[in-house]
Regions:
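Conserved P-loop NTPase-based nucleic-acid remodeling module centered on helicase motor cores
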Residues: 49-50, 58-141, 177
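P-loop NTPase Walker
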Residues: 1-96
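A sequence-level detector of short, solvent-exposed, charge-rich linear segments
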Residues: 38, 83, 99-103, 107, ...
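Accessory N-terminal region flanking or inserted into the helicase ATPase core
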Residues: 1-25, 29-30, 50, 122-206
Length: 206
């Protein structure tokens, strides 16, 4: 059952909780107050341990930093991507990189930049059966831009939210798989790949 609390009501710091509220309801304010409460009352932090405050956007990081000006040395505020990269990918990725033929010597983390030049699309199309029927290269590019890692019930798949077509024919999964293989062989790790490889590392090395 849900418990309704006022934003200035301290919670037990060893108890899990979830906040559900609409825009402008004071979620960030409540979170800041809770962080301060943990800093003031925790018996486990000591002098060297820090609180990890993980958000999904850089704007969230900046907002929280701005509201905790005196706690920078005790609170690590970062996005989920930077947290996973610094604490999982950077120190441990080399354990699984060979499985994916990832060119670690060229590794570059990028956001939404995709390898979709004419040459890249040509190479990717060679992984599709009956390649000659997929003539609309722009549709293939759009399919890649629409794709994300999603859990299909057994594993993660890189694919669009719904089947997409090129020249009236549904683009097969092999095309999306080929893109990831192509990007990794060129040392490109997209933001979503940070989540993907972190998941793979935690599953293989729990």
């Amino acid at each position: 059952s849900a418990t309704v609390s006022e934003s200035n009501t301290p919670r037990k710091i060893e108890q899990h909780f979830k906040i559900k509220a609409g825009p402008g309801a004071g979620k960030t304010y409540w979170l800041i107050q809770h962080i301060k409460h943990v800093l003031n009352t925790s018996v486990r932090l000591g002098k060297i341990k820090r609180i990890a405050c993980i958000t999904y956007t850089n704007i969230g990081v900046e907002t929280i930093h701005g509201r905790l000006p005196d706690c920078a040395d005790r609170v690590e505020v970062c996005t989920i991507h930077s947290f996973l990269y610094d604490n999982i990918i950077k120190p441990y990725f080399h354990y699984i990189a060979p499985e994916y033929n990832f060119a670690t010597d060229k590794m570059k983390v990028v956001d939404d930049t995709l390898l979709t030049s004419n040459g890249a699309i040509y190479q990717l199309k060679n992984n599709i059966r009956k390649v000659q029927i997929y003539k609309d290269d722009d549709a293939l590019r759009q399919a890649l831009f629409s794709s994300r890692w999603v859990f299909d019930g057994t594993d993660l798949k890189f694919k669009p939210p719904y089947p997409m077509k090129s020249s009236r024919y549904t683009i097969p999964q092999s095309f999306y798989d080929a893109y990831k293989k192509y990007a990794w062989e060129h040392g490109i790790m997209h933001y979503d790949d940070v989540l993907y490889f972190s998941y793979k590392l935690m599953v293989k090395y729990p």
